[in-house]
Amino acid sequence: MSHHKKRVYPQAQVPYIASMPIVAEQQQSQQQIDQTAYAMGNLQLNNRANSFTQLAQNQQFPGSGKVVNQLYPVDLFTELPPPIRDLSLPPLPITISQDNIVTPSEYSNVPYQYVRSTLKAVPKTNSLLKKTKLPFAIVIRPYLHLQDSDNQVPLNTDGVIVRCRRCRSYMNPFVVFINQGRKWQCNICRFKNDVPFGFDQNLQGAPINRYERNEIKNSVVDYLAPVEYSVREPPPSVYVFLLDVSQNAVKNGLLATSARTILENIEFLPNHDGRTRIAIICVDHSLHYFYVPLDDDYEVSDEDDEESDGEEEDEDEEEEDVDNSETIQMFDIGDLDEPFLPMPSDELVVPLKYCKNNLETLLKKIPEIFQDTHSSKFALGPALKAASNLIKSTGGKVEVISSTLPNTGIGKLKKRSEQGILNTPKESSQLLSCKDSFYKTFTIECNKLQITVDMFLASEDYMDVATLSHLGRFSGGQTHFYPGFNATSLNDVTKFTRELSRHLSMDISMEAVMRVRCSTGLRATSFFGHFFNRSSDLCAFSTMPRDQSYLFGISIEDSLMAEYCYLQVSTLLTLNTGERRIRVMTLALPTSESAREVFASADQLAITDFMTQNAVTKALNSSMYSARDFITKSLEDILNAYKKEISMSNINSVTSLNLCANLRMLPLLMNGLSKHIALRPGVVPSDYRASALNRLETEPLHYLIKSIYPTVYSLHDMPDEVGLPDFEGKTVLPEPINATISLFERYGLYLIDNSAELFLWVGGDAVPELLIDVFNTDTISQIPVGKSELPLLNDSPFNERLRRIIGRIRENNDTITFQSLYIIRGPSINEPANLNSEKDMASLRLWVLSTLVEDKVLNCASYREYLQSMKTSINR
């Protein structure tokens, strides 16, 4: 417990400083850059050219009429330690002249959280783009939160959807009204269209101001789609749970844990229209279907009365129908080659609204039914085929929860031998490829039937994540991996249940398609994310989740003649409310003939996403070496291009490594990406590698950056206000420090956040007072280590502040991830040697050290060494 209001723990005496001195001229330049970075940190999304904050950062070139971002050159060696505050800054502003916006407002251009371009100034020609070696792509996230109600966008419900007759793009804030407002010119293809009747009227026929319409004022808008945008009636949301009931799942507690979690969250499944339906199939060497009758106490609602046209006798008949004594029934199907449905599908896929109580009863019974099982089989392939047959008329989500490698029936897998293959050129082809073609062909069928597959794999054994992840990759789903799961561990159970709960309660869209339309001369040519590429530019999602991100590569096929170019992302989908909607997001970007302007407007975080997606593709389709080589060569090309096009006149170009300030974090991120568990050299179990690659494919940008360059907080010396609520009630977080062990004091306390886990590093020589305040013990050997949680110490304000900080980091409404906390004791000269516990601690320490990516990690170069190798390479 704390013995006084505030302790002062030992403080570092010598701050971490750059290892190379900064001369006066460099200091002046550094001050300029820092001032700019500070201004950027306070920018609001505002496209008006006379915005004060933008004018503070941008410059206008004589005669151009355009406001562009300034280029600030820096020597990367004088930027050590790297200024990591840049990683949390918003992107460079996009400045669009008011003359090019129908109704200028801060919502005229799409917020970067929805669509973020790698370039804020687009080269007018492909040759200029090639010269800069910078990629042109957009990062897309159609929905920002797990629940749609957390962030609603303007909705048009009048049925007036104005589209260009030539390119089929939607009206947006950048069109031009001509001919006294009777026509409008498309900003994407320049075609002149008629303004439709009803555009200037409301639903009652009264005149309205067209300049107040949502699509004119907002770059992100939803439309309530009329019937012509649907090929059939909006289907209900359907969930089929495939539960592994083999010995493994029973012994490690996954079956009981998952059944209880589904039970506790069944009422939180999206059911806005009251039509959500559920089926449960248990799987071992057979398929076990369940017939779930209507609840005995179900009463007909007013809505049901209306459906029966208010006829009292119909109501009586309905009450008679539901007042029955039917019981839950289980049907065992042992024929895995030709599995058949034991009864009609509409009796196995039951309405949640009418069967909730009986579903809860079934979920309570399932662990009891299979508690004495002796079956070690798991027939996933036949179960998937059965599930698709069950919901082929509606589509929906198949939720697979398993602890066992599929080992019988179609899609049967065997453990792959990793010995002698890990960390060799054969690793990708022999360990990370899809082992059975069933998992590829089945996803094609899923897309035809509008079915998504999500995997929750929790086991202490090999699961062939590389193969099973194909199910989610091409159906709009996801694979979640819980290695070493055991329900006897409260921390394992907490992580699994939190993530499954968030996943089940997440809003979804069904029958979704996404397309990007570009200005003449531009075309989307590469597509990354979990979906099915149905045609050259149409991405199909059986269901669209809310926690994934996508990236589209853009090519310049013809010269761009206009001052601005446009990219419009449209998504057609069906909500759980039963509504068919269209979400339209329009991005306007200035064009440029200057390499200097293009470099000055490049977005280092979006570029990192582009590099990541391409590296993951190469890792899966070629080799780990080709993925790392792609990262290295891409960065070398950018540095070479900058040297040639921008800094050739600099007399210090041979002794320095120059880049613009807005890209100064890119080398650090590329170095970190090469050290990520998904891509780094060394022996990494294939399930871990495949899971990490799968996560990189879909991670929203801010989490992706954190997984590449983890956030590190120093806690023992945090200011008084940190860990306490601010004026908005949010817990104040410490300022991050650089991810390097050189900043760690032997007596310090540090928290590391890599977006997937949290690590609490306790210095081996931490003072007893600190240990008492955090763990209620003055002996470091007595603190909990490994996967754990901080103890609740009501008498310790410091302990409460730490728990608040951890809680704030875990408090996210845009991801299902719950970060487990690992407590690690740092080395000390007094610690015992050769104990098993110390060997375990050594592996934990190695794991933590691998997150400190500025250092030399597992034979990967430190950041300084990485820069030196880059300088040597481009000066050859």
UniProtKB/Swiss-Prot annotation:
UniProt keyword annotations, A-Z: Cytoplasm, Endoplasmic reticulum, ER-Golgi transport, Golgi apparatus, Membrane, Phosphoprotein, Protein transport, Transport
UniProt name for this protein: SED5-binding protein 2
GO biological process assignments: COPII-coated vesicle cargo loading; intracellular protein transport
Additional free-text comment from the UniProt record: Present with 1720 molecules/cell in log phase SD medium.
Molecular function terms, GO-annotated: signal sequence binding; SNARE binding; zinc ion binding
Protein role: Component of the COPII coat, that covers ER-derived vesicles involved in transport from the endoplasmic reticulum to the Golgi apparatus. COPII acts in the cytoplasm to promote the transport of secretory, plasma membrane, and vacuolar proteins from the endoplasmic reticulum to the Golgi complex.
SUPFAM superfamilies per record: beta-sandwich domain of Sec23/24, C-terminal, gelsolin-like domain of Sec23/24, Helical domain of Sec23/24, vWA-like, Zn-finger domain of Sec23/24
Complexes and interactors: COPII is composed of at least five proteins: the SEC23/24 complex, the SEC13/31 complex and SAR1. Interacts with GRH1.
One annotated Gene Ontology cellular component of this protein: Golgi membrane
Compartment(s) where it occurs, according to its Swiss-Prot or TrEMBL record: Cytoplasm; Golgi apparatus membrane; Endoplasmic reticulum membrane
Residue numbers spanned by region Zinc finger-like: 164-189
Assigned protein family: Belongs to the SEC23/SEC24 family. SEC24 subfamily.
Positions where Phosphoserine occurs in the chain: 51
InterPro entries: ADF-H/Gelsolin-like_dom_sf, Gelsolin-like_dom, Gelsolin-like_dom_sf, Sec23/24_helical_dom, Sec23/24_helical_dom_sf, Sec23/24_trunk_dom, Sec23_24_beta_S, SEC23_SEC24_subfamily
Biased composition (Acidic residues): 300-324
